[in-house]
Structures are given as structure tokens and as C-alpha cells.
Amino acid sequence: MAVVVVLLAIALIVVNVADIRIRRPAAGPEAPAETTLPQFPFGDEPELILGSGETPARDAEQVVPVDGEDKTMQLVTGSFAQRGGPDFSLYLDKGVFLSTELDGKCCFARADDASMDAYLEIGYHMGADAQTLAGSLLNDYGTIASMETLGEVKLGGLTAYGAKGVTVQRELEAYLIPTANGCISVVLCHAGTAPASWYDSLLASAQTLQITG
């Protein structure tokens, strides 16, 4: 009888131990290992051109003459600081034209102009000579049937080196503005099928361009 009691006691102890192990709270989740985010080299950093840079001392809106008619345009700002370039600003009819960034350049075109029949593009070229680049820049915009360099010209209050070119479908104008470490390019493009008022408005915007820094 004593042996039976001892065996029952041992069995009870084993059951209790097993029960304790089963009911023991599970360990909390392991803390995630600390990860180091990859650091992009300078050339691979996502660019932010539009809306960046120092805020210029210019009004938020300005009346701009467009082909003899006054238009109220809104201030657009940007900076090419990530490319070693200056800040810039200009006035644009934001109710008609959209502002976008592509391949390190800013493009202004109508929302309903899917074919890009008229647009204004502003870019920065680190280390480039404005006068030299004026002779070749338009080759980046298609097969140029004919081209003419204009020498030193004015774009609003800025001095630039100009060029004009023609492709099968479009006419192009380029203005290369010297800066401290390179030059800024301003390119106007318009197709013969696009209303002249589109080009006139974009040219008026380009003539309000200011560069700082």
C-alpha cells in the first residue's frame, strides 16, 4: 500500500511539472535587429527641385503682359542645389500650366496637352560653358533639320546665349544662362498645330525668370 501511495505522489508531481511547463508564458517577440538604411551616393539621391531653395523676395502673384494682354501669374520656385547649381524663380499661369520634374529638369506644360505641343523646360548643366552648349543643346530634343545660333541675347533681365532649331514637327528656342559653376538652360518648344497663345504665355513666363545663388 505504501508503494502505491509513493507512486501516486510521484505521478502527481510529474503532472504538475508538465502543467507548469505548458502554462508558462511564451517569450515575447524578439526585438528586430537594428538595420542600417542604405545611403545613396550623391548622384542617386532623389531630387527635389520645385519648391526647394531659399524663398525669393518676390510677390506671390504678378501681372505679366502676354501678347498685349495682362495675365495674373503665380510664383514658382526651385533649386538645383543638389546638382551644385543656383536657385531660381519665375511666374507661371498655374491655372493652365502644370509643373513637373523629369531627369533633373523642370517642365511646364498644359494639363490637356498630352502630346507636349508646347512646353517650357528649365535645367542646369554643371561645369558647362553657356556659349559652347548653345551650339549643341537642341540635339537632345530630336533630329534637328536646321539650327541657328543667336549669340548673346536677352531673356527678360538675364543675359544668355541663344539658339533656334526646327525638327519635323516642332520649333525650339534655347537660352543658356551662365552661372558661377555652369549654366542654366531654358528651352521653349512649340508645334505648328499648337495655339500661338500657349507659346506666348510660356515665353512670358520665361522672361520673368530670376536666378539667385
List the predicted regions and their residue ranges.
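N-terminal, intrinsically disordered, polar/charged segments of Gram-positive cell-envelope systems
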Residues: 1, 20-80, 84
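Gram-positive cell-envelope targeting signals
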Residues: 1-46, 163, 173-176, 185-188, ...
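Short, hydrophobic/aromatic-rich segments at coil-to-beta transitions
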Residues: 74-80, 104-106, 154-164
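Secretory pathway targeting signatures of secreted, lumenal, and periplasmic proteins
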Residues: 77-132
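Short, solvent-exposed coil/turn segments at beta-strand boundaries
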Residues: 94-95, 112-115, 156-158, 177-184
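Solvent-exposed loop/turn segments at secondary-structure junctions
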Residues: 127-129, 167-170, 190-195
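Signature of long, low-cysteine stretches enriched in small and polar/charged residues
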Residues: 138-181
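Surface-exposed amphipathic alpha-helical segments
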Residues: 183-213
